């Protein structure tokens, strides 16, 4: 949400010179932008500032038995681009090469330098029990995998890659400002679910 320098000073208990100096620095770096005018009760209008949504992006990839889904979101969790293509999962390097090729085409509006600078990371959701630390699919009925290393997929990207169970990833994608306590059910080729307590 947008705010003002005065509000930042009050909320963080900082002096105005400190706030002005930091805001100037963030504006110059493009991390924040001026978003219009801010009119708090009983005060004159001031320039409002907020996060620059296009300062950084994150990419999401959904792997299923027969499809590959891709999405790009900005810092406001707004979908900038999305695509779903038919791609049958196979457990060898040819699949990794295809995923890398499709991802490169999906991000073709960014050059290599922009991708390294602006892309924070890639989240990959997979149906099954995932060990994120070991980059391992412990078991997946949908993909017919067991104790399967995901390192080959991680190597397809030059940014951090995070793996998650598909239902858990879908739960995290929901707006937790609206749903403080929620259960997510995934009804696809297999039944899955995730839950969130207290936001």
Task: Describe the role of every protein-language-model region.
Residues 11:
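Residues within the alpha-helical elements of helix-turn-helix
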Residues 8, 19-32:
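Basic amphipathic alpha-helical segments that dock to polyanions
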Residues 4, 33-34, 39, 131:
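Short beta-strand(s) of the beta-wing in winged-helix/HTH DNA-binding folds
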Residues 45-82, 182-199:
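Gly/Thr-rich phosphate-binding beta-strand-loop-beta motif of the actin/hexokinase/Hsp70
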Residues 1-7:
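Short capping segments at the starts of secondary-structure elements
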Residues 82-181:
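Glycine-rich phosphate-binding loop and adjoining helix at the ATP-binding site
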Residues 34-56, 163-184:
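Conserved phosphate-binding catalytic cores of ATP/NTP-utilizing and phosphoryl-transfer enzymes
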């Amino acid at each position: 949400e947008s705010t003002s320098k005065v509000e930042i000073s009050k909320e963080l208990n900082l002096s105005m010179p400190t706030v002005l100096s930091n805001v100037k620095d963030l504006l110059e770096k493009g991390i924040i932008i001026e978003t219009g005018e801010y009119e708090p009760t009983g005060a004159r209008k001031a320039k409002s500032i907020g996060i620059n949504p296009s300062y950084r992006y994150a990419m999401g990839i959904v792997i299923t038995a027969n499809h590959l889904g891709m999405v790009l979101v900005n810092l406001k969790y707004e979908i900038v681009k999305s695509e779903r293509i038919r791609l049958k999962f196979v457990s060898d390097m040819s699949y990794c090469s295809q995923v890398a090729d499709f991802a490169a085409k999906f991000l073709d509006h960014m050059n290599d330098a922009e991708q390294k600078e602006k892309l924070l990371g890639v989240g990959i959701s997979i149906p099954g029990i995932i060990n994120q630390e070991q980059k391992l699919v412990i078991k997946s009925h949908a993909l017919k995998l067991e104790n399967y290393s995901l390192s080959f997929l991680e190597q397809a990207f030059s940014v951090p890659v995070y793996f998650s169970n598909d239902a858990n990833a879908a739960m995290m994608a929901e707006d937790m400002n609206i749903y403080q306590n929620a259960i997510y059910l995934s009804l696809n080729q297999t039944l899955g679910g995730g839950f969130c307590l207290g936001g």
